[in-house]
Design a protein with these regions (language model features):
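Hydrophobic membrane-insertion alpha-helices, especially the h-region
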Residues: 4-18
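Structured alpha/beta or helical-core interaction and ligand-binding surfaces enriched in interleaved
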Residues: 17-147
Length: 147
């Protein structure tokens, strides 16, 4: 009996931990530098995190080969219309945009940010603010860090 109760409790705790790790959190942009540090410290080369900018749009932070990147995926035809504004905003902030893909199907627009978390967060904030109207008080839906 005790073993069954213990097993049940452990199963519930494991389920809560699992689902909580997959649920988006609502925070402000001030949490980005800490998240960037966690991302850099993560040993999984496929780890990333992002936040919704509006409805289903999202910006993603990626740490690859010692560099931090800000990515914007053009995953459907309507999103392709945002490529030019993204490039223009990036250029206004002194960045060039490269293209890559996560799945060899959809284009991802990529900006290389500073390797210093606080600077990278500020650089990305400028882009997010100008392109999507985000400000420091905006509650953002952070996408779970994927590993």
């Amino acid at each position: 009996m005790r073993l069954a109760v213990l097993a049940g409790v452990l199963a519930v705790v494991a389920a809560v931990v699992f689902f909580r790790s997959r649920v988006a959190e609502h925070r402000t942009y001030d949490d980005v530098p800490g998240r960037l540090k966690e991302l850099r410290d993560n040993s999984d080369p496929t780890a990333f995190f992002g936040f919704h900018t509006r409805d289903v749009d999202a910006l993603y932070f990626v740490y690859e080969n010692g560099a931090l990147f800000l990515d914007y995926e053009l995953y459907n035809s309507p999103k392709e219309g945002y490529a030019a504004p993204f490039r223009k905003t990036a250029a206004a902030h002194g960045f060039s945009v490269t293209t890559t893909s996560y799945d060899q199907v959809h284009t991802v627009l990529r900006i290389q940010l500073s390797s210093v978390e606080s600077e990278a967060a500020e650089q990305a904030y400028g882009i997010a603010h100008d392109l999507f109207g985000i400000n420091r008080a905006t509650k953002l839906e952070f996408l779970p860090q994927c590993t």
